[in-house]
Each structure stands twice: as C-alpha cells, then as structure tokens.
C-alpha cells in the first residue's frame, strides 16, 4: 500500500444538494423487486448455470414471490436464447410474472433479443450503454453526443420492433451504465432524450435503471444522486426509477435502502449478493431488513435454508456462515454473556408478543430456522449457553449455582479439546460428572416410613468398598432423615444448602430430577449432586448421595491421605 494514497486516488466529489430530503425519510413499504440472478448473477459464475439449473432457479424465484425476473442475455449465447424460448413456449411464466432480458445498444443484438421474446404475454427489454467520462474516453472513444445518440436510436428501434409484435405488452428499461460515475447533468440529458424517444405514459411507464455499476462512494452520495435525478427527470409520473447497486465498497445494502428513501421505486439485485466482482446488492438481506421493521417485503423467505441450499447447488458458490439472516452462524451465540441474555430473553418472550430478544433481530422460526443452534459452546462460552443446551435438548433445567459450577467443567473440556462442545458432548459430560454410579458411596436401596410423631425414618443401604452398610436416621423430613443416616458413615457432618426437584417431561410416567447443594466442614465451598429416577424420593436420595461423593472427592484433593468417610470405611478410590 502507498504511504500517501492521495498521490494515486482521489475522493469522490460530493453532490450539491443542500436541501436533500432523504435523511428525514423512513422506509414504509417494499420497492418493486427485480431478480437478476439468472443474468447478472449467472454471468459472474466460474461455471454458468446450465438449462436445468437455470430452470430450478427460475421456479424458486417465482415461488419466493418475484414478479420481475431478468432471465437472460439472449444475444450473448445460444444457451440463453434457448432458455428464454423454453420459458415462453413451455408455459413456465405465471400470469403475474414478467421476464426481463438484457441487450447492448447494437441493432443486430437488439433484433435477436426481441425475437427471443416472441409470444411472451409481457416482457421488459433492457438496454444499456456506458455514459461515464472514463468509458466515453477510454473504452468507446466518443463524446457526450455520441453516447446520447446510441441511447436514443436504440429506444426508437425497439419501439419500432415492439409495434410489429403487438401480442406482447412491452416495457422499456434503459440503464446509463456506470451511472454512479456519470455527471448528473449528462445522465439527466440522456434519460430525458430516451423518454422523448419512447414516449411513456403514466399507464405504461418506462424504467430508468440507475446503476452503481461500480460502487465509488459512501451510500449517502448514491442517495443524493438518486434524489437529484428523482427531482429533475422530465415526465416523472411516467417513469419507474430503479437502482442496481454493486457492493465494491461493501455498502450495497445501505445504498439501496437510502436510494429508496431518496425516491427509487424499484431495486435490482441477486439472492445472497451474487454478481460481478463483489456482487450485486443482496435481495435477501434487503427483504428481511424490511421484515424486521414490521414491513411486508412481498417476498417469502419462510424456508430460507432451502433457498440457500438451492442457490449453492445452482451457482456452486457457498453462502457465508456469517451471511445476514441466512448463514449457519448468524443465529448462534458462543459468548457467555450473549448466551445468558438470550436464555433470559426466551424465558420471558410471549408467543404472540412483539419480538424483543437480546442479540436476535428476528425470530429464527419466521425464516424456517430452528432454535437448536442458537446456543453453541466453546472456550469463550459461559453458563447461559451450557444451561440452554441442556434444557432445550434434554429437559435439564439446572439451578443457577449449578449452572455456574458445571460451566467451569465444560470450560475445562473445551480448553483441553480446542473445539466446540456439542449438546451431546455436554450431556455426556453432565452424566459423567453428576449421574455416574461409581464413587465412594453407592446407593443400593432405601425404605422410608413416617413415625407417630410425624417425623420420618429411613433405612438406607449403601455400598462402600464392595461392602453393604445399613444406615438409619430420623428427621423432620426425608432429606433430614437421610443426612442423619449418612452420618453413620461420614467423618464430618454434611448439610444441604439448597434443594430443588422437578419432573423431566410431562405426564404421569415422567422421571423426576432432584438437585441437592451440599457442604461439609473442611471442604471449600459447596457442590451439587443430581439424581434422576422414576420415583421422586429415590431421585432426591441419589442426588444427596451423589453430592456426598463429590464432596468426598474435593476433600481428598484438598487434604491428601484423609477421607470424608469414617475410618475403616474409606475406599482407596477417589472421585475425579
């Protein structure tokens, strides 16, 4: 890169429009959409689509809801010509859809293009010639008058041919190519001359397409150019003002939105921004931007994954995983704080309420996406993501402090592996950490009975070092009695700081899950035990026994050579 880029590049001159009005406008309705996937998008592929893939793309565009589709450049190849003929002769064009074709401003190409449309009910014939100074000077070696003459003569020729083919309802579209780099007064002069040659009416309008063939400036400059033309074009009521932004500077979406605010009636582009160089404006993003503001875009992306896969297959180009609304990762949060916010948002979001969700601008379900991949866990993730995956995938709604405890265990896993932890990975780790049967104390069975004074008596059978022990205890309730019974085999008293229980699923046959937070003298902090069983009391006992096992492991790590179990009962094994 140059140390002083001003020696090679110059800024785009601002547009003199001090009374511009577009900044105070808002988008309130969708523009007319025109898909050029089959023409502009197709010509930019490593391997242009064959007839079968073009037909698949055309039918999908119709299904999405496009009413104007640029189908081909018929004079450029026999493949394109034949495709247009198949659309017409094969009856593939619905009554409410108009196909458009492109041609350069040359008589032989115009005549062949018009012939390709013979028999069509309606058609848009799109003619272009470059108007910017650099093209006039460098490419065509002509002056302003020469460029204008080409545009006017083409319009007159097409009008003459159209009058000889009255079975088709014709719409004329003219594009001053490289409008974004053309002097505004000259672009206006050419367009007004074409208007006079075609003679449109409010009932049969002409389309002036003003392309940012190369995106040269910030989107506000393009908006100024469009508003200037919108104000100054003659017979504006007989004109549809169209824009065709390219994405050379990465701001085509913003340029299109501001252009509509500035007076544009119509937007041309491609699905997912396909097209020459950096691509055309992305019509999916534009449409879903409107949708996210409560505006019907007139295009249906209810199954956007299917649209993406069809486009990938037809174009052989992948959709980027970060592509707005569509990419595999756009509804995914790895960050712990993001995950926690999303989890809380889902907890309070009502089904029919206005969508107010942290980090998710639209409901993924509206575009056919699931919630399965919203929360994904890597080394940067926190408790919210882990909790969401366990709850959404396995029905495990952990208490908040257990979320904190278990997330550190997951963090160790992802740090060690250096990869994402899937929901299945997390569930396996949860089972290994809280539900496995091995440990210093193994639950065997219990019998619970209520005494005359209302207290509870428990007879608990546990396995320690391959020997069964019977422990008995009395307490105010089953958990209190259980703690008293365990005192017979423990060297230090255990206390239950917190306990929760709930059903895993719905119905009478649903298993119960219990969470017990335990602490003991000589053991730092507290630990959780979890139990799952068809019987709620058994689940709670398993949770407490599991928690005691984890306390014993922590005690052994903090005080090597000592055990939480009474002398003579401690097994040699330690709980990891």
From Swiss-Prot:
Catalytic reaction(s) noted: 3-methyl-2-oxobutanoate + acetyl-CoA + H2O = (2S)-2-isopropylmalate + CoA + H(+)
GO biological process terms, semicolon-separated: L-leucine biosynthetic process
Subcellular location: Cytoplasm
Cofactor(s) annotated in UniProt: Mg(2+)
Source species, domain of life: Bacteria
Record pathway: Amino-acid biosynthesis; L-leucine biosynthesis; L-leucine from 3-methyl-2-oxobutanoate: step 1/4
GO molecular function, one term: 2-isopropylmalate synthase activity
UniProt enzyme class: transferase
Keyword Lyase assigned: no
NCBIfam families reported in the protein's UniProt record: leuA_yeast, PRK03739.1
Subunit field text: Homodimer.
Family listed: Belongs to the alpha-IPM synthase/homocitrate synthase family. LeuA type 2 subfamily.
Name of the protein described by the UniProt record: 2-isopropylmalate synthase
Native organism: Ralstonia nicotianae (strain ATCC BAA-1114 / GMI1000)
